[in-house]
Amino acid sequence: MTKCKIILVISLSILALLCIGCIENSTINTKTTVNSTVDTKTIINTDSVEEYDIATANNAFTFDLYSMVKNEDENVLFSPYSIFSAMAVCYDGTEGSTKEQMSNAFYYPLNKLVLEESSKKMIGTINSNNDAYDLETTNALWVLENYTLNEQYVSNAKNYYDGMVTPVDFVNEPEASTDTINKWVEEKTNEKIKKLIPEGEIGPDTRLVITNTIYFNGTWVKEFDPDITRTRSFTLSNGDEKSVSTMRIVEKFNYGEDQKAKILELPYKGDNLSMYIVLPKENNITELENNFTLKYYSKLKENMSTGDYVEVWIPKFTFKTEAELKSPLIEMGVVDAFNPNAANFSGITPDKSLAISEIYHQAFVDVHEKGTEAAAATGAIILEEEIEYTWEFKADHPFLFMIEDKRTGCILFIGKVESPEYEKMS
């Protein structure tokens, strides 16, 4: 018996993609693991938009997923917001146990209207204009020509998620359909993600592709002077050393520490976004990762001090990552959505034979003296050699980083730098 499938492709910082087509029956592992310190029941059972904290929900999911995808001796990068947002569009069409499992894993409220209103507000905040940086999130739905979607689902996608519907011919022109979507992705990501959907992925069985993008390009409030960037030693988790291009600055930054780790805030121009770097005091990133929860991260931030000069050393880094998220999400309890015999996406279409077959994730980050991604800025730079500093933040071994929207408290990106490399991106 043939069933229909949902393939979810998510590009970190850039795209989340949902395909609905057909899949053969398969067996799904039902192990469930959740590693959050958040009260799930309180979050998902609220019926009030005012009481539902979508940023806390997103951030709780962030740490749950990180605990599943962290990899020893490898760089890590993903956009929890992109995944959270794309799956919210998907969640809007779920019912029954499929809905309940996704609610538990993503901290979505069971009352869909609460999530819809909260998401609309979040999207509006993220997309508000600011000349100091580029930050935009977008949604789009690409549907098979003449395929029936529920009118209410289409209306919700447009009104709450700003998701416009475009008909495409997956059956007769799968390659052209792939090119159309990939070119849209390339445009929305400033050409940083190209050919996201692989050749042959879209075919006659594809019914719907849902894309969610979040793109960020910002410059530091306090830029690093490229003239004092030097090649310095960086010690990997296994003890090996490598030479990396390392930036240095002495400036006033928000800084904190406890017995295990140091935390530093590097704000971006525009005052709305910051990168937070968490550096273990010893070269033991695995131990930090194993105990890195939303509660611990929040406590580190709460104990940060202001007004002191900090000597900062961090490597330049740029890398791309790819991951398949089906397995970790199943471990987090999203089981039925992947099972063609159990999935219930009846809110999307009258066709009841839909299921997710796989979730793909791509990621890109570029951190250098000017900021994150590619950006140009001018400004006077103080010669930090002449300044006395109180604290030292020397990232010469693996560390974690988060890019956060301070208006909402929402973590947009999270990653680990295990082995920094830098290649100037065009």
Swiss-Prot record:
GO molecular function: serine-type endopeptidase inhibitor activity
Gene3D superfamilies reported for this sequence: Alpha-1-antitrypsin, domain 1, Antithrombin, subunit I, domain 2
Entry GO terms, CC: extracellular space
Sorted UniProt keywords: Protease inhibitor, Serine protease inhibitor
PROSITE patterns assigned to the protein according to its UniProt record, in alphabetical order: SERPIN
Record-annotated disulphide pairs: none
Site feature (Reactive bond) residues: 384-385
CDD domains: serpin_like
Family: Belongs to the serpin family.
Protein name, per record: Uncharacterized serpin-like protein MA_2246
